[in-house]
Curated annotation (Swiss-Prot):
Residues that coordinate or bind heme b b566: 60
Name of the protein in its database record: Cytochrome b
Organism of origin: Gomphosus varius (Bird wrasse)
Annotated binding of heme b b562, by residue: 46
Example of a GO biological process term: mitochondrial electron transport, ubiquinol to cytochrome c
Length: 95
């Protein structure tokens, strides 16, 4: 939960300073890293937090495989749907 909360907060702070215009997108990222107080830290926390979040998800899936939780079909299918939703959300956030 803490990892997801930090992703939401850092993403919100980054979105406050980011512009998606094709001419100024790179400049806004440079502005975040150079001019915003601790902008470089917020950007790194957001990027590395996403990787850590997926590592935690994969460890959780591995634990479920190890203990045979895939035998509970309904629960396992809900987990697969949640994994796909998280992956789609991360892709949309990346693009």
């Amino acid at each position: 939960g803490l990892c997801l909360a930090s992703q939401l907060l850092t993403g919100l702070f980054l979105a406050m300073h980011y512009t998606s215009d094709i001419a100024t997108a790179f400049s806004s990222v440079a502005h975040i890293c150079r001019d915003v107080n601790y902008g470089w830290l917020i950007r790194n926390m957001h990027a590395n937090g996403a990787s850590f979040f997926f590592i935690c998800i994969y460890l959780h899936i591995g634990r479920g495989l190890y203990y045979g939780s895939y035998l509970y079909k309904e629960t396992w299918n809900i987990g697969v749907v949640l994994l796909l939703l998280v992956m789609m959300t991360a892709f949309v956030g990346y693009v």
